[in-house]
């Protein structure tokens, strides 16, 4: 019991609030579900999420994956999970899908990749944000940042109403950088401001991986993720291991990413190709 497990989840309650969902390879147990969405559709969505993460990383080494609401509440999707109940700019399926994906991807990564959370957090945070961005691009390319609010007369002509959901990442990061509030990604976790630790640092790390993918190619970055995951799954690893893997697959100079982008606050105008 507990062999090769990186986390022990204790749930003490008089009632079992967890539901079990069977995917093709892993049983998912969670108390984070939407009663409006039927169980079959929920299972289909969870299966799609799991296959998506496995496509980028590799197979999950355990038979069960526990996703609890308490952990998700500490790592919400800012701008989505904090909206009042009476404001519903996004469809129920979209909101639950992304909420579960963020919770699942964090559990998946934390349960398999053992990196120093004080120094190498940028890689796990960046990988999770990278997965979120790619998932939305693949399955929800039409969703706007403001959801259905963007269609309201009087608002739809404003530039912000035309932004896609994924545009929030560069928008928030660049705004923070212009205010000189961002911190470098090699800043120790205990020295980060709450805003950088919870939001900006994660966005900056994920965007950095997207910029890197544009620079060296999606094929190379995907192969690097998979090799890093395969070599280090359930073992202690360092972000330098990822650097060595990526560097071995390209002759391009990567110092702009591993030195300037990660270790400084240099203001460079990066763009992501559509």
What are these regions (language model features)?
Residues 1-11:
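Extended, low-hydrophobicity, Ser/Thr/Pro/Gly-biased non-transmembrane segments
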Residues 5, 25-27, 269-273:
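Ser/Thr- (and often Asn-) enriched beta-sheet segments in non-cytosolic proteins
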Residues 9-121, 127-135, 139, 194:
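Juxtacatalytic substrate-recognition/specificity segment
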Residues 36, 61, 194-274:
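Amphipathic alpha-helical substructures
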Residues 55-59, 71-76, 169-181, 205, ...:
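Glycine-rich, acidic and aromatic/proline-enriched surface loops and short helix-turn segments
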Residues 61-68, 118-119, 142-147, 223-224, ...:
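Surface-exposed patches in mature extracellular/periplasmic domains of secreted proteins
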Residues 96, 115-120, 145, 217, ...:
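Short, surface-exposed helix-loop/turn micro-motifs enriched in polar/charged residues
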Residues 119, 125-207, 232:
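Acidic/His/Gly-enriched intrinsically disordered linker/tail segments
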